[in-house]
Curated annotation (Swiss-Prot):
Name of the protein this chain belongs to: D-alanine--D-alanine ligase
Superkingdom field: Bacteria
Protein localization: Cytoplasm
Free-text function comment from the UniProt entry: Cell wall formation.
Family the UniProt entry places it in: Belongs to the D-alanine--D-alanine ligase family.
Cofactor(s) this protein requires: Mg(2+); Mn(2+)
Positions that bind Mg(2+) 2: 267, 269
Keywords associated with the record: ATP-binding, Cell shape, Cell wall biogenesis/degradation, Cytoplasm, Ligase, Magnesium, Manganese, Metal-binding, Nucleotide-binding, Peptidoglycan synthesis
Length: 305
């Protein structure tokens, strides 16, 4: 990369969401990669200073390594557009839609993309009504949170109530979702092209926050080991799921493949993790792209905003 073309780069990290600690890890990894690539890059934590300082400090573009609320929900993207600062990842609308699992599901269903059935919950929702609709077990999670925070698997009324309360601590929008038994997969999208699929095998329980970021027993396989034909079919559908939300630059589409080899798409992450446990760098490595090359390519795509 010709560093004169990108100028002074701010790596947004940390922030105010429940995923702050993961964002700090992602941001530091991104910052180190950019600096190794001789990019004039600096850390910028919006939790400790106003975004307008980006202009005062002379930044020319932004690498968004924020996760969750106020980072990948369109808020920061809107502020950066008002300041006319190019940034990585998707724009305002796509970021907001992808952050909202409820509205993502509505769009995907309208577009013919397979996603688990769901019911929106409130404090008056009855366990039996929801169980009759979705079957047991079922998943309860906040609609607008990432890293599986507030997510629980339930199969009885007592757990249903406690899981609802746990999810409601993160978001006023809570959904119950059909549980799909199958293989956990993720499809990374880079520059409108799918990368090799990553298969995720959890030792026990769900692929939750602990399993994602701290467990040493969670196993990842990339390439996934699926047949070439099935892999291509999933990648094509994942790319469509990415595009139909209006996503640009890069994203990570999560899904479950059931016993009939039918993919059920769960969500799209528009600012995926970039830690040592993260899946996009793993998929890129399988495609022959080093971590530093991946970070630089994502930054280069910011020129399209």
């Amino acid at each position: 990369m010709n560093t004169r073309d990108v100028g002074k780069v701010a790596v947004l990290l940390g922030g105010r969401s429940a995923e702050r600690e993961i964002s700090l890890r992602s941001g530091q990894a991104v910052l180190a990669a950019l600096q190794r690539s001789r990019v004039n890059a600096h850390a910028f934590d919006p939790a400790g200073q106003p975004l307008e300082n980006l202009l005062q400090q002379g930044f020319d573009r932004v690498f968004i390594a924020l996760h969750g609320r106020y980072g990948e929900d369109g808020s920061v993207q809107g502020a950066l557009e008002l300041m006319e600062l190019p940034y990585t990842g998707s724009g305002i609308l796509a970021s907001a839609l992808a952050m909202d699992k409820w509205r993502t599901k509505m769009i995907w269903q309208a577009a013919g993309i397979n996603t688990p059935d769901y019911v929106m919950l409130d404090a008056s929702s009855r366990f039996r009504d929801v169980a009759d609709r979705l079957g047991l077990p079922l998943i309860i999670k906040p609609a607008r949170e990432g890293s599986t925070l507030g997510l629980n698997k339930v199969d009885n009324e007592q757990d249903f109530r406690s899981a609802y309360q746990a999810a409601a601590e993160y978001d006023s929008l809570v959904l119950a979702e059909q549980f799909i038994q199958g293989i956990e997969l993720t499809a990374a999208i880079l520059d409108d092209m799918p990368l090799p699929l990553v298969r995720i095998d959890v030792a026990e329980g769900l692929y939750d926050y602990q399993a994602k970021y701290f467990s040493e027993s969670t196993r990842y396989t990339c390439p996934s080991g699926l047949s070439a034909a099935l892999t291509t079919r999933i990648q094509e559908q994942a790319l469509y799921a990415h595009r139909i939300l209006g996503c640009t630059g890069w994203s990570r589409v999560d899904l479950i493949l059931d016993e009939n080899e039918q993919p059920f798409f769960l969500e799209t992450n528009t600012s995926p993790g970039m830690t040592d446990h993260s899946l996009v760098p793993m998929a890129a490595k399988a495609a022959g792209i080093s971590f530093d090359e991946l970070v630089v390519q994502i930054l280069e795509l910011s020129c399209e905003h």
